[in-house]
Swiss-Prot record:
Species per Swiss-Prot/TrEMBL record: Vipera ammodytes meridionalis
Name the record gives this protein: Acidic phospholipase A2 homolog vipoxin A chain
Gene Ontology terms for molecular function: calcium ion binding; calcium-dependent phospholipase A2 activity; phospholipid binding; toxin activity
GO terms for cellular component: extracellular region
Location of the protein in the cell: Secreted
Transmembrane segments: none
Keywords: Disulfide bond, Neurotoxin, Postsynaptic neurotoxin, Secreted, Toxin
Expression sites (tissue/organ): Expressed by the venom gland.
Main localization (coarse): secreted
GO biological process terms, semicolon-separated: arachidonate secretion; lipid catabolic process; negative regulation of T cell proliferation; phospholipid metabolic process
Pfam families cross-referenced by the UniProt entry: Phospholip_A2_1
Family the UniProt entry places it in: Belongs to the phospholipase A2 family. Group II subfamily. D49 sub-subfamily.
PROSITE patterns: PA2_ASP
Function text: Heterodimer: postsynaptic neurotoxin. Monomer: Acidic phospholipase A2 homolog that is non-toxic.
């Protein structure tokens, strides 16, 4: 769920998720449209695509099992849907961590009205 994802983000980026990523670019946060603005926003676009492939549970509210082991995020559910959601969040958190140097304050609280270009395909 989004709280668990926020915990993963904090572990991988050192940034508090709500303030840094809840309304960032065209895809970080609830929903998304247009073209991702930078590498950080592309991480969120990829997560949205991943969520789109998870059909049997609600990715933003599903509670899954995970742990941190030697700095790695380890998903632990036997339930395939919950594990898939965890893996989507895990991949996005790792991506955000790998691209933390591209984080641009100009895209914080970015208005969705600027996100008018055609979206890439998942």
């Amino acid at each position: 769920n989004l709280f668990q994802f926020g915990d993963m983000i904090l572990q991988k980026t050192g940034k508090e998720a709500v303030h840094s990523y809840a309304i960032y670019g065209c895809y970080c946060g609830w929903g998304g449209q247009g073209r991702a603005q930078d590498a950080t926003d592309r991480c969120c676009f990829a997560q949205d695509c991943c969520y789109g492939r998870v059909n049997d549970c609600n990715p933003k509210t599903a509670t899954y099992t995970y742990s941190f082991e030697n700095g790695d995020i380890v998903c632990g559910d036997n339930d395939l849907c919950l594990r898939a959601v965890c893996e989507c969040d895990r991949a996005a958190a790792i991506c955000l961590g790998e691209n933390v140097n591209t984080y641009d304050k100009n895209y914080e609280y970015y208005s969705i009205s600027h996100c008018t270009e055609e979206s890439e395909q998942c």
